[in-house]
Design a protein with these regions (language model features):
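Solvent-exposed loop/turn segments at secondary-structure junctions
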Residues: 52-55, 82-86, 113-117, 150, ...
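Extracytoplasmic thiol/disulfide redox context detector
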Residues: 2-85, 155-158, 162-163, 197-206
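C-terminal cap of thioredoxin/glutaredoxin-like
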Residues: 133-206
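Extracytoplasmic/secreted envelope proteins and their assembly/folding machinery
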Residues: 60-67, 90-94, 107, 124, ...
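Structural microenvironment flanking redox-active thiols in thiol-disulfide oxidoreductases
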Residues: 69-100, 104-132
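Conserved strand-to-helix beginnings and helix N-cap segments that scaffold or border functional pockets
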Residues: 57-60, 87-91, 185-188
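Sec/Tat-exported extracytoplasmic proteins
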Residues: 52, 67-70, 97-101, 114-118, ...
Length: 206
């Protein structure tokens, strides 16, 4: 009985120490103008990224593994930043791949093509040639890249990026208001540990 009490006390102290490990203002920040969340009881996590970002390429395996381990109370999505014309083209490529249901391996192939093969996919022609490798005819790629639906998504993402003041990638947004970003000396695993910490704080029963 006494041993069990000590065990409970130890676990409580351990949990508190873990929770106190990360602090608002030092390890993560809060935005001035948060985005509204869509569903009560669901913690929304968004990765702001760009295919041309070397850090995003390195982060991709870790964030994908992390996302696959989340339960039903966490919603995860990626948001390609549409800053410049090249960013917008890559963002349109991201949504085209999703719309055509080409799967995660195609997103990985984009990163590899850019960062390993040196093809930056900075023109529609190069993107059309790239997607031909996945059985997509150039005219179909054109239709999707220039579709009203995808342009709407780019406009939405541009608005959200401005509102959240996203200035670098990769960057994680939790529940539309908490920002976890890459910092010198911070590993990607540490970044995800901070995200986990913020998620736990945001869950209804926390």
């Amino acid at each position: 009985m006494i041993k069990n009490k000590f065990r409970i006390i130890f676990l409580a102290i351990f949990t508190i120490s873990i929770s106190a490990e990360y602090r608002l203002g030092r390890d993560y920040s809060i935005v001035d103008n948060p985005l509204p969340v869509k569903k009560d009881g669901i913690v929304e996590v968004t990765e702001s990224f760009w295919y041309g970002c070397g850090g995003c390429y390195s982060f991709e395996p870790a964030i994908n593994d992390w996302a696959s381990e989340q339960g039903e109370d966490v919603s995860f999505r990626k948001m390609p930043v549409p800053w410049s014309k090249t960013h917008q083209l890559h963002a349109a490529l991201y949504y085209t791949i999703n719309a055509l249901e080409l799967g995660p391996s195609t997103h990985t192939a984009v990163f590899v093509t850019i960062h390993k093969e040196g093809n930056f996919l900075q023109t529609p022609k190069r993107i059309k040639n790239f997607l031909k490798n996945f059985g997509v005819e150039p005219e179909i790629t054109d239709q999707y890249l220039n579709s009203f639906t995808i342009k709407q998504k780019l406009n939405r993402d541009a608005k959200h990026a401005r509102q959240l003041k996203i200035s670098s990638t990769p960057m994680i947004v939790v529940d539309g208001k908490y920002i976890v970003e890459v910092k010198q000396g911070r590993s990607y695993q540490e970044m995800l540990n901070i995200v986990d910490h913020v998620i736990e704080l945001q869950k209804p029963n926390s």
